[in-house]
């Protein structure tokens, strides 16, 4: 369902399917009801949409028996575009038996650079660095932070960009690192955990607290 103008849509609905000779189902109106109808109608095996859609579709999907294990065709479900709450991941898996594959990319990077296979999902984590890319969490001075400390996500890889005229983006690339504008922490096993946008952080008693963390607690 992502627009083709987004990196998520360009990769998920054009480049990746074409690279393996897969057929693509493009819907003019890709709202959750239309997505659910399209899966059995076209024998869809991989569903690509945002976390909000998975949450909205879960209860109806439970009755439709869409997954291969339930007698349907659906084998994989991919999510990006916004943070994937652990509750949404669990809700969809309970309804379909399928673990959502999460990931984060950026239009400037033209690729998802942190993700995980479906058998290596960790609730609350986006995943690990995709082969070919490097990622770390930096402090305000551009120094790598240790595991468990929230900082700015910085990425290097075979794709990237530079801004030429927009003064607001003059700090996007520093020392070859692309700063995505996301606040993350890395756990001891190398999994990246999204916290918030870097302009959406709450600082309390010297700690950086992500707004989504507060929302989940409430």
What is each of the regions a protein language model found here?
Residues 4-46, 60:
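Conserved AMP-binding/adenylation subdomain of ANL enzymes
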Residues 19-22, 41-49, 58-122, 134:
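Gly/Ser/Thr-rich phosphate-binding loop
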Residues 31, 52-54, 84:
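Alpha-helix capping/helix-boundary segments
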Residues 138-139, 180, 186:
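Hydrophobic alpha-helical segments, especially N-terminal targeting/anchoring helices
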